[in-house]
Amino acid sequence: HLNFRTVRFETEALDTPNYQGNAVVNYTEREVPYTRIIEHKHFEMFGQAVYDNPKTVISREYSTEWKEGMEPYYPVNDDRNNRLADEYRALAAAERNVIFGGRLAEYKYYDMAPTIESAIRAFNAEK
């Protein structure tokens, strides 16, 4: 089977009105054990009352190895997995009346906008 990475979240409420000033901050340093911190109140949909609250909620995201029963998030980009993904793509191409798409089916990392674009392209190709 194809290998994936997954994530786990640790969420906590903090006694500060603003922890990081942004909804998402990514961390790429090897010494930092998490990949990003999400401060939920900074997503624009909540309104001023949430920003005025003297507390905030953050979630730290940790990348971890995927195991059976866990949700797969990210493909593992190495030779073995890429070769196996190519084999699966060849099998998928032989199927009729089925569209395989998204991170899992394409074995490709996608942000949301390219995911939607890929889905529209796949749909239009079936017309």
Residue ranges and their predicted role:
Residues 1-91:
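Mid-domain catalytic core of redox enzymes
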Residues 71-127:
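C-terminal catalytic lobe of FAD-dependent flavoproteins
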